[in-house]
Amino acid sequence: MTLALVAAVILHLLPVQPLRSSRVVPRGSPPHRLMMCKQEADPQPALDWIRTLDTLITRGLDTVEDAFLLARRVADKSVDPIDCLEAWEDATDPRPRLLIIGSGWGAHALVKIVDADLFRCLVISPRSYFVFTPMLAASSVGTVEYRSITEPMRASNPRAAFIQGVVEDLDPITRRAAVCIGDADGKEADGKEEEGPCRQVYYDICVYAAGVRSSASNIPGVIEHCKFLKELSDAQALRRSVASALERASAPGLSEEERRRMLTFVVVGGGPTGVEYCGELSDFLVDAVQRLYPPLVPYAQVVLVHSGAEVLPQFDPLLRKRALETLRARRVKVMLNARVSRVDSPQRIVLKQKRFGDGGAGSAEVTWDVLELQCGLIMWAAGTGPAALTETLVRRLVDCTRTADEPDEPDETSTSPSEATDESGLRPEFWARQWTANGQVVASNAVGVPTATPGRLTVDPWLRVRGAPVGTLLAIGDASSCYSADGSLLPQTAQVAAQQGAYVARLLNRGYDLSGLPQGAAPSSSPGAMLDESGCELAAPPVSHAAVAGDLQRTLALRGAVEARPFAFLNLGLLAYLGGGEALSQVQVGNNRLLSEAGSVGFLLWRSVYVVKQVSPRTRFLVLFDWLKTKLFGRDITDW
């Protein structure tokens, strides 16, 4: 796959500028290359491609290393002790203790790649399996089955220990985690309440990948009355609710108004989750209702409520327009510029929709219409919020990234920067500095410098949490606040989380000292270091002491990178399913767009990518089989 991407990049470099679409150029137009030769050359695209090629080559070599590690792991037939905490606390084992919290995209990528021969690896999560979250919408209507998009965490790395439990507290200073063993609900398989034992787990390095939860945005009634689509249990609940609505609407003695209300499904949020659920649900209604409930066809309707002016704001404008047209052609009622005021019950939602004057969207005259929708189900896909443990950590850690427009001023009477302090007792030059994504320190009042993001752990370019003892706590995925080289905040997507997890695993496998200090140096003894309130250091990149000491073999293994490269996110594009065999596919490599497709071609790309990105051959086969089964026999609407 890496070679294919490199080939695509080289082919893309041949024209001066790529064509967006063959339909854009009139038939009689002169050749594109001749038209562009008169324009001045812009060096920035070439520089972007050079950086992208460098990243692609690096990722390709990384993949080769990972393959050798996997082959060695397959050949290893050793069996670890059944009591993983006993082995974890074994003082005679010289390997560092690596604690991984979570079982999402970041944690799964990390566990799959990390070398468990170098670390005592322990994964803790209330969920014992990984979920391919982009296909949760498909599983909620029976297009694919739940088990086809899940993989046990233990299967990702047999040498890594796993505990199904909840981390109730995490102290980054003492490096201690309070773990309650058992799933998040505290229930056994028979549904009985069970108070799981709590243990104190000490670690040397912790990777925090706990993700996020669905956000209600403090709107009354959302938590009590809405369905979500964040976990597998959410997809199961949606599937049961939709199937139950069809059965109830087909019962005798109901009025047309009652049937129409029961079969009106409201989806809040016009991002990828909301749009894909609308597409899958419209497919389900066409398939199931026309096949098994023909009299209910006139009553079924999907309503999409979105606060913005366009759905799927992450995509190109032309693709956003195509998405809106496709949804409406599928009989999805799209309500733009509409915000939810409250949710009174599972059958009643109150909105306010923006209405512009005669001048359209640019008109200064704006009014709000209050609307009430009667429905049978409300699915909430309007954003996410931090997990409870993340909020606790954010409050506990020192805030090392105050807002850029309110920096602390240094004490002008002090002759030594190390002696100047602000009201909190911290050195003001610490607040006046900030890491950029390329590992450089710049002034905090510079344009585009990252600042703290509410509800997320701020990390440096090597994904170390700022405010914790350096190199002991890292954060990846949705729970982290990480910035790209241009100073923009990386999105909370599976693509970002998976790349971060793989990056941290390779950082650990290569033996970098995450503290970045000279060998044997104490944190406070490093010259010029920036310290937080706890004396924790945030200055130097991870370094290989063996390579610094002149170990040629280690230097070659690191490809000359004595100091670790900062994390670089490689954006490969966006995908979204719209229903009816149509999808959006925005394919890119870094900042360089390769193609943008909608309709059946986009659908083919969407399915191809999702099959390739499955985490195991088992899930890859099951997803293909489910698609074939649905095509031949339709979706299963059993209420279970």
Give each language-model segment a name.
Residues 1-25:
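N-terminal chloroplast transit peptides
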Residues 31-99, 103-110, 116-119, 147-150, ...:
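N-terminal plastid-targeting presequences
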Residues 43-85, 95, 505-640:
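C-terminal, flexible cofactor-proximal segment of oxidoreductases
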Residues 44-50, 54, 58-67, 71-72, ...:
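Beta1-alpha1 glycine-rich phosphate/pyrophosphate-binding loop at the start
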Residues 46-74, 83-90, 95, 160-264, ...:
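FAD-binding core/adjacent interface of flavoenzyme oxidoreductases
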Residues 159-171, 328-343:
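A conserved beta-strand/loop element that lines the FAD pocket in flavoprotein oxidoreductases
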Residues 224-254, 373-506, 527, 532, ...:
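FAD-site-proximal beta/loop scaffold in flavoenzymes
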Residues 259-335, 491-510, 514-523, 528-529, ...:
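Rossmann-like dinucleotide-binding core of oxidoreductases
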